[in-house]
C-alpha cells in the first residue's frame, strides 16, 4: 500500500512540476514551449532537463503563422497532446543560439518571447495575488481576440484604477492563440516600481528582439525596402572589413567570427517575422504617444499636484490637475512618470536637427561602422518623431473638421497627405546621402588597404634575397584586398539590381570598367612574380590554390551580372540561348583586353615558357563552359623578356580579334534578322498573290457554270414573261415530250 501511494505522490509531483515555473530568468523551464529568431534555428524547451534544445532537423527557422507554430509544437513534442499555443507573458534569455547552415553556436545571449505549447484541455493559469493587489477578470463571449488584445485590455483596466498590471492569463480559448477573456492582477504603483526599474535595466543590457523592424509608414514603404537592402549591403562590406588577415592559415574562421556580431545586429533590425509577440512594440508606441501629449488641466477646477512628461526637456515636470478630463500624460509621482516615459528619452534626445550633419562633417576613421550605425539611428529617431507629430496634427485636424463641408475635409486630407509625402521624401534623401557617404568611406578604406598590401608585396619581392614564404604571404594579403574590392563592387551591383533595375542598368558600364581595372591591376601585380623565377616556381602550387579559392565565389556573381536579359523580337527561336550569351560575354569582354581566364592560376614560369607565336598570334580561346575547362595551362610567365613593342602588338592583336568577334557575332544576328524579314515579306507577297489567283479561278468557274446552264436548249420556244411559274414549268415539260393526259382525253372525244 505504501509503495503504491509513494508512486502516486511522485507522479502528482512530476505533473505539477511541468506546470510551475522554476526559474524566472529562463522562462517556464519545464513547460513545453518554442522560441524563434529569424536567421537562426528554432529552439524548444526540453521538458526533461529544463534546457533549450535546437531544432531536431537542423533546418527550420522562424514560422510566420499560428497554425504553423501549433504544428511545429506537435512535431517537437510528439509524445504530448498539444492542442493550442499562446504567447508567453515574459521574455526568456537563450544562450548559444545556432545560426542556420553554420556549425558554430557561440554567440551572445538573445532575449525573445517564446510560444507556450498548451497540453490537453485548456486550463487557465494560476495567478499569484500579492498583498494590496487585486485579482480581476473580463470575459466577452461575442469577442475572439489574440493575446495582444487581452493584454492591452488588462493593462488599460489597471491604468484606469491607477495601478500597474502585475500578471495576467488568458481565459476561454476560441481558436489558435485566440481567447474570449483575460484574468489579471493589478498592484499599486509603489509595489511595481521596483519591477519596472529592474526590467528596464535588464532590457538596456541585452539585445532584445521583439519580432519587428522599425516603424513603417505607408507612403515610404518602398524607400524603406531600398534602405534595408542597402544597409544589408553595407553590413556585408563591414563584415569583410572585420577580417583578420594576419592569420594566413585560419583566415576564413577569423573572418566568420568577425562577421558574427554585425550579422546578428542586421538580423535584429531587418528581420520581420510574426513568431514573437508584438505586445511590447505596441505598448512602446502607446507609451510614446501618451508621453508626447501636452499636460491638460481638464474642465474641473481642483488643484491636484501631478506630474507629466515634457518631451522637449526629456524629463518629468509638475503641474496642477483639475480633477477630471485631461489626458493620460498624468502621473501621481515623478518616479512613476519617469518609469513609464523614461524609454522616450533616447528617442527625443537623439533627434537633434544636426544629428546626421555631424556624421557627414566628421571624417571617416577605423570606427566608421559604429559612427554610421549611430547616425542611422539618429536619423530614424528624428523621422519617427516628425511623423508622429504630423500624425497627431492630422488626427486633431480631422476631429475639428467633422462639421466642415466635404470640400474642406478633402482639402485637409490632401494637405496632410502632401506633408507626409514630403517628410518621407526628405527622409529617403537623407538616408540615401547617409548610405552613399558611408559607401564612399568604405571604398576609400579598401583602397588604402589594397595600396598598403601592394607596397608590402613589392617590398618582399625586392628583398635580397627574397623569401618565398614571405612573398606568398604578402601576395595573399594583396589578392584578398583586391578580392574584397571586387566582392564589394559585385554585391553593391547585385543590391542595386534587386531594388532598382533602372539604376543598375545605368551603372552597369561603370561597374564593368571598375572590374576591368581590378583584373588588369591583378594581372600586372601577378606578373611581377616572373621577375623572380625561383620564387615563382617554389610557390606555384600555393598561388594556384589561392587564386582558385578566391575566384570561385565571384565568378558566378559576375556571370549573372554580365548576362543581359533576353529580349523578344517576336521569334525567340531565332535568338541565341542564354547559355550562349553568357559564354560569349565571358569569353569576349567589352574592350577585349582581358577575360576571366586571365586571373586563373598558371603552371609554367621562366623565360622558356614564352609561346613562340606571341608576336603574330593570340592563343585561341577555349570555348568550353567554365566548369569543364578546369585550370588553364597556358603560360603566363616570360613577360619580363618581351619587349614593349611586342606587348603592344599582342594587346592590339587581341583587341582586334576580340572586337572582330563582337562584330561577327552581331552581324550574324543582323543578317539573320534581315533574312527572316525578307522571308516574311516574300511569304506575305505569295499569300496575297495566291488569294488573287484563287479569286480569279472561283469567278471563272462560276461564270463557266452559269454559261453552261444557259446554253442547254432543244429548240426555240418563246415564253411569255407574264406566265406563272406553273405554266413555265409545263412549257419545259412539253419541250421534253410530255403530254398532258387530260388534254389527250379531250382531243380523243373531239375526234
Curated annotation (Swiss-Prot):
A motif (OX-2) lies at residues 344-346. It comes from the Eukaryota. The record marks 685 as: Implicated in free radical propagation. Pfam families: APP_amyloid, APP_Cu_bd, APP_E2, APP_N, Beta-APP, Kunitz_BPTI. A motif (Basolateral sorting signal) lies at residues 705-715. This is Amyloid-beta precursor protein. Residues 1-17 form the signal peptide. Belongs to the APP family. The modification Phosphotyrosine is found at residues 478, 738. Glycans are attached at residues 523, 552. One of its GO terms (molecular function) is heparin binding. Residues 18-682 are extracellular. The record marks 197-198, 219-220, 652-653, 659-660, 668-669, 671-672, 692-695, 701-702, 720-721 as: Cleavage. Residues 316-344, 363-428 are annotated as: Heparin-binding.
Amino acid at each position: 500500500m505504501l509503495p503504491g501511494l509513494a508512486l502516486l505522490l511522485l507522479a502528482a509531483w512530476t505533473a505539477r512540476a511541468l506546470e510551475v515555473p522554476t526559474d524566472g530568468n529562463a522562462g517556464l523551464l519545464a513547460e513545453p514551449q518554442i522560441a524563434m529568431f529569424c536567421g537562426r534555428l528554432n529552439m524548444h524547451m526540453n521538458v526533461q532537463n529544463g534546457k533549450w534544445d535546437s531544432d531536431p532537423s537542423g533546418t527550420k527557422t522562424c514560422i510566420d503563422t499560428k497554425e504553423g507554430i501549433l504544428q511545429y509544437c506537435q512535431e517537437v513534442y510528439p509524445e504530448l497532446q498539444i492542442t493550442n499555443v499562446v504567447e508567453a507573458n515574459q521574455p526568456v534569455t537563450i544562450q548559444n543560439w545556432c545560426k542556420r547552415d553554420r556549425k558554430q553556436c557561440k554567440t551572445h545571449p538573445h532575449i525573445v518571447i517564446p510560444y507556450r505549447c498548451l497540453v490537453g484541455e485548456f486550463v487557465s493559469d494560476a495567478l499569484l495575488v500579492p498583498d494590496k493587489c487585486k485579482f480581476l477578470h473580463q470575459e466577452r463571449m461575442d469577442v475572439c481576440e489574440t493575446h495582444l488584445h487581452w493584454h492591452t485590455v488588462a493593462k488599460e483596466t489597471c491604468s484606469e484604477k491607477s495601478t500597474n498590471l502585475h500578471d495576467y492569463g488568458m481565459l476561454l480559448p476560441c481558436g489558435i492563440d485566440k481567447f474570449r477573456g483575460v484574468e489579471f492582477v493589478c498592484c499599486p504603483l509603489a509595489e511595481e516600481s521596483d519591477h519596472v526599474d529592474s526590467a528596464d535595466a535588464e532590457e538596456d543590457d541585452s539585445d532584445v528582439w521583439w519580432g519587428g523592424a522599425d516603424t513603417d509608414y505607408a507612403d515610404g514603404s518602398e524607400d524603406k525596402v531600398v534602405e534595408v537592402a542597402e544597409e544589408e549591403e553595407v553590413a556585408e562590406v563591414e563584415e569583410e572589413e572585420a577580417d583578420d588577415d594576419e592569420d594566413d592559415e585560419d583566415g576564413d574562421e577569423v573572418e566568420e567570427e568577425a562577421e558574427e556580431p554585425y550579422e546578428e545586429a542586421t538580423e535584429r533590425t531587418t528581420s520581420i517575422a510574426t513568431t514573437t509577440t508584438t505586445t511590447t512594440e505596441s505598448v512602446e508606441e502607446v507609451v510614446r504617444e501618451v508621453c508626447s501629449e501636452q499636460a491638460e488641466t481638464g474642465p474641473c477646477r481642483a488643484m491636484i499636484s501631478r506630474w507629466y512628461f515634457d518631451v522637449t526637456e526629456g524629463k518629468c515636470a509638475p503641474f496642477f490637475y483639475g480633477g477630471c478630463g485631461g489626458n493620460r500624460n498624468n502621473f501621481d509621482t515623478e518616479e512613476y512618470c519617469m518609469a513609464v516615459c523614461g524609454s522616450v528619452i533616447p528617442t527625443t534626445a537623439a533627434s537633434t536637427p544636426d544629428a546626421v550633419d555631424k556624421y557627414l562633417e566628421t571624417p571617416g576613421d577605423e570606427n566608421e561602422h559604429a559612427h554610421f550605425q549611430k547616425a542611422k539611428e539618429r536619423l530614424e529617431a528624428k523621422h519617427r518623431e516628425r511623423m508622429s507629430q504630423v500624425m497627431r496634427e492630422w488626427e486633431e485636424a480631422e476631429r475639428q473638421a467633422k462639421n466642415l463641408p466635404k470640400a474642406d475635409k478633402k482639402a485637409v486630407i490632401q494637405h496632410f497627405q502632401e506633408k507626409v509625402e514630403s517628410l518621407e521624401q526628405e527622409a529617403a534623401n537623407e538616408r540615401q546621402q547617409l548610405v552613399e557617404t558611408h559607401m564612399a568611406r568604405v571604398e576609400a578604406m579598401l583602397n588604402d588597404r589594397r595600396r598598403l598590401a601592394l607596397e608590402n608585396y613589392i617590398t618582399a619581392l625586392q628583398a635580397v634575397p627574397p623569401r618565398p614564404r614571405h612573398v606568398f604571404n604578402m601576395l595573399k594579403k594583396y589578392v584578398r584586398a583586391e578580392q574584397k574590392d571586387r566582392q564589394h563592387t559585385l554585391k553593391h551591383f547585385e543590391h542595386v539590381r534587386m531594388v532598382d533595375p533602372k539604376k543598375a542598368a545605368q551603372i552597369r558600364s561603370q561597374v564593368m570598367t571598375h572590374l576591368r581595372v581590378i583584373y588588369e591591376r591583378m594581372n600586372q601585380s601577378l606578373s611581377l612574380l616572373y621577375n623572380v623565377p625561383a620564387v615563382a616556381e617554389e610557390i606555384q602550387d600555393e598561388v594556384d590554390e589561392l587564386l582558385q579559392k578566391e575566384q570561385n565565389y565571384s565568378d558566378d556573381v559576375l556571370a549573372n551580372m554580365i548576362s543581359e536579359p533576353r529580349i523578344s523580337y517576336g521569334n525567340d527561336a531565332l535568338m541565341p540561348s542564354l547559355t550562349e550569351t553568357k559564354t560569349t560575354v565571358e569569353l569576349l569582354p567589352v574592350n577585349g583586353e582581358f577575360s576571366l581566364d586571365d586571373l586563373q592560376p598558371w603552371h609554367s614560369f621562366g623565360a622558356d615558357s614564352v609561346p613562340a607565336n606571341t608576336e603574330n598570334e593570340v592563343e585561341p580561346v577555349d570555348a568550353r563552359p567554365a566548369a569543364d575547362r578546369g585550370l588553364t595551362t597556358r603560360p603566363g610567365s616570360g613577360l619580363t623578356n618581351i619587349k614593349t613593342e611586342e606587348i603592344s602588338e599582342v594587346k592590339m592583336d587581341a583587341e582586334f580579334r576580340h572586337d572582330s568577334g563582337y562584330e561577327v557575332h552581331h552581324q550574324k544576328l543582323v543578317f539573320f534578322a534581315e533574312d527572316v524579314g525578307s522571308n516574311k515579306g516574300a511569304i506575305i507577297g505569295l499569300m496575297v498573290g495566291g488569294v488573287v489567283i484563287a479569286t480569279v479561278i472561283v469567278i471563272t468557274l462560276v461564270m463557266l457554270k452559269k454559261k453552261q446552264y444557259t446554253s442547254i436548249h432543244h429548240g426555240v420556244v418563246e415564253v411569255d414573261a407574264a406566265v406563272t411559274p406553273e405554266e413555265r414549268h409545263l412549257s419545259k415539260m412539253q419541250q421534253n415530250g410530255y403530254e398532258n393526259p387530260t388534254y389527250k382525253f379531250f382531243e380523243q372525244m373531239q375526234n
